[in-house]
């Protein structure tokens, strides 16, 4: 696809199984870029199930990968060019990333043999890393007062100081396999397992 005008054939099928066909003229303008091969600085990766996330200014896209290792690629959204890649040494299926208002990227990985929560500066350098009691297969959540909540696959909910990675508290929950964590407007924390959904006040 490049800047141009295209004619697209369209067929609509209605609930009564009748159809109607026609064509649409589509104009593509301000074309930026189409696709990019995740290969930069000698590091490659396949995109995992986690979705990409964006910097606060919308200019950088962060893409977590899974194999051959779980690198995090930073791409300029205007040009499609790589800015940097943060290397993680092993396969990291699952997990997820989020971006704080100050631009720090928090990356959780589904691997229990290495550090599995990373804080990465906007320039791609490591801020801190910690190893929790199990792999993390879902997205973390960040509170307005700077607490990062992660739920591991052993169903342990961790509250981490987002600035240092220090563990503020942890709570074992019933059930196996933790889900993503959510925080409401009042700061209450919600975490689900295969057994139940739990709610905690910000100070536990």
Regions flagged by a language model, labelled:
Residues 6-8:
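Amphipathic, non-membrane alpha-helical rod segments
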Residues 27-204:
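Flexible "stalk/tail and boundary" regions
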Residues 10-12:
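Conserved structural position at the C-terminal beta-strand
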Residues 14-23:
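Short, exposed coil/turn segments at beta-strand boundaries within extracellular/luminal domains
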Residues 1-4:
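Conserved small/polar residues in nucleotide/adenosyl-binding loops
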């Amino acid at each position: 696809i490049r800047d141009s005008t295209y004619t697209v054939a369209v067929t609509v099928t209605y609930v009564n199984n009748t159809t109607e066909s026609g064509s649409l003229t589509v104009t593509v303008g301000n074309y930026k870029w189409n696709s990019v091969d995740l290969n930069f600085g000698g590091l490659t990766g396949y995109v995992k199930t986690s979705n990409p996330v964006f910097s606060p200014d919308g200019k950088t896209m962060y893409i977590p990968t899974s194999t051959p290792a779980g690198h995090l690629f930073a791409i300029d959204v205007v040009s499609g060019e790589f800015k940097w890649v943060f290397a993680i040494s092993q396969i990291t299926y699952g997990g997820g990333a989020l971006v704080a208002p100050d631009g720090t990227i928090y990356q959780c990985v589904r691997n229990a043999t290495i550090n599995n929560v990373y804080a990465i500066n906007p320039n791609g350098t490591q801020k801190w890393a910690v190893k929790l009691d199990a792999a993390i297969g879902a997205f973390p959540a960040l509170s307005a007062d700077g607490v990062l909540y992660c739920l591991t696959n052993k169903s342990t909910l961790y509250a981490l100081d987002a600035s240092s990675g220090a563990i503020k508290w942890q709570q074992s929950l019933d059930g196996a396999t933790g889900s993503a964590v959510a925080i409401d407007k009042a700061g209450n924390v919600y975490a689900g397992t295969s057994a139940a959904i739990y709610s905690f006040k910000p100070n536990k």
